[in-house]
């Protein structure tokens, strides 16, 4: 599908349920519609970032603690920020296990194939998320700080600024809040708890 058609599809979507992604381990694409009624935490991840250990372990912790109550954490590896996800899809899990975080680490949440989150080749899910939530709620001025590191085109004001930006999606599939890379994953827990306490959506 060409970039224009991807952008049109993202603009027409009303929720994340319109999108699908292929699991990192391979197999058929997963429709996010299959997660209807769940609270979703979506992050663009990288295995060689300065916050890889912190964010990956905190993503695991949230999935472990809140998964039984209806949270689903989704990770999308991306190499657009400092080339910090330069491994092939089939190498990423071993990188996480033996390098960073290392120590036998295994993600307990859903990881998908590498994708782009900005520019003409952006995954339509991220084009939709950026349109729905143009800036992080904790830092509305968050932007890529070093123009030399911008490798995509076109550049937009609502672009993801770096690895580990977070998007919180309600049980109706509607994006509710975006958090910058500086906002620790574990600190989203109160917002997740508030959504889980409302019970499943009938949407």
Swiss-Prot record:
Keyword Electron transport attributed: no
Tissue specificity note: Expressed in platelets (at protein level).
Keyword Cytoplasm appears in the UniProt entry: yes
E.C. numbers: 1.11.1.9, 1.11.1.12
Major location category of this protein: cytoplasm
Annotated site location: Subject to oxidation and hydroselenide loss to dehydroalanine: 49
Function: Catalyzes the reduction of hydroperoxides in a glutathione-dependent manner thus regulating cellular redox homeostasis. Can reduce small soluble hydroperoxides such as H2O2, cumene hydroperoxide and tert-butyl hydroperoxide, as well as several fatty acid-derived hydroperoxides. In platelets catalyzes the reduction of 12-hydroperoxyeicosatetraenoic acid, the primary product of the arachidonate 12-lipoxygenase pathway.
UniProt protein name: Glutathione peroxidase 1
């Amino acid at each position: 599908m060409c970039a224009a058609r991807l952008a049109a599809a993202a603009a027409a979507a009303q929720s994340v349920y319109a999108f699908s992604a292929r699991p990192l381990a391979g197999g058929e694409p997963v429709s996010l519609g299959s997660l209807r009624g769940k609270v979703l935490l979506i992050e663009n991840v990288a295995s060689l970032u300065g916050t890889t250990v912190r964010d990956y372990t905190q993503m695991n912790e949230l999935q472990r603690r809140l998964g039984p109550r209806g949270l689903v954490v989704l990770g999308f590896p991306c190499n657009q920020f400092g080339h910090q996800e330069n491994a092939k899809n089939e190498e990423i899990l071993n990188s996480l296990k033996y390098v960073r975080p290392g120590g036998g680490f295994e993600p307990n949440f859903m990881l998908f194939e590498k994708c782009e989150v900005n520019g003409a080749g952006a995954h339509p899910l991220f084009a939709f998320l950026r349109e729905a939530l143009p800036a992080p709620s904790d830092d509305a001025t968050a932007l890529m700080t070093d123009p030399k590191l911008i490798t995509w085109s076109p550049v937009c004001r609502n672009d993801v600024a770096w690895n580990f930006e977070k998007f919180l999606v309600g049980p109706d599939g509607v994006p509710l809040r975006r958090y910058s890379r500086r906002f620790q994953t574990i600190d989203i827990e109160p917002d997740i708890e508030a959504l889980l306490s409302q019970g499943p959506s009938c949407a």
